[in-house]
């Protein structure tokens, strides 16, 4: 598979390559919108989400901090790495005006093996589907999560994505939670920064498609 580097900025690509080439990050997997955009090429993405399913407290934040200090001229919030936490949101780059947001977070165990392309360890799109399904059950779901689910629905059955979402979040969400999440779609605020779609899709049509998918899913359950 060729990655869609046109979906990310040159600065993000450079940061991702630096990190991916270091053994220090072997326990981390790229997830989120950037991971999906690189594989599907459907929209631009602007940050780096790196998740690890190692045991809590095992992240070597001291070495992470040293690496980021040594490899990036500019950085923000590195002092947060001095404390043990579920995750860290940082910024790195060339200067104060040219930065990339990088998140390092603990996560539940991955349910699909990662994929390695160009030395980048990427979550399987099925894993991202499971994560996105979980994300739309939150109190205030994000527009881009619905957008990504719509793109994934061209590749996978909705029923399968629901099952993966429950498997990955078995203690926290149910099928009913997922349906309720989709029922909020008309109330979702559009992303302030907008969604730079590379496939000519429109939010109103995406909403209609997803409503139909969920409606069919519910009707099939009643049979």
Give the label of every model feature segment:
Residues 1-223:
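Compositionally biased terminal segments of proteins
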């Amino acid at each position: 598979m060729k990655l869609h580097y046109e979906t990310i900025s040159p600065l993000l690509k450079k940061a991702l390559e630096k990190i991916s080439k270091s053994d220090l990050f072997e326990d981390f997997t790229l997830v989120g919108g950037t991971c999906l955009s690189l594989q599907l090429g459907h929209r631009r993405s602007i940050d780096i989400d790196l998740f690890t399913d190692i045991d809590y407290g095992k992240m070597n934040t001291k070495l992470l901090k040293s690496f980021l200090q040594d490899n990036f001229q500019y950085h923000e919030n590195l002092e947060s790495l001095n404390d043990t936490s579920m995750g860290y949101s940082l910024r790195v780059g060339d200067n104060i005006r040219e930065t990339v947001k990088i998140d390092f977070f603990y996560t539940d165990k991955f349910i699909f093996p990662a994929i390695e392309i160009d030395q980048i360890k990427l979550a399987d799109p099925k894993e991202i589907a499971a994560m996105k399904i979980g994300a739309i059950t939150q109190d205030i779901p994000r527009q881009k999560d619905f957008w990504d689910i719509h793109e994934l629905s061209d590749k996978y059955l909705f029923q399968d994505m629901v099952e993966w979402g429950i498997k990955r979040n078995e203690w926290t969400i149910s099928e009913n939670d997922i349906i309720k999440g989709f029922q909020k779609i008309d109330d979702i605020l559009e992303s302030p920064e907008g969604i730079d779609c590379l496939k000519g899709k429109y939010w109103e049509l995406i909403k209609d498609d997803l409503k139909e998918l969920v409606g069919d899913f519910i009707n099939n359950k009643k049979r």
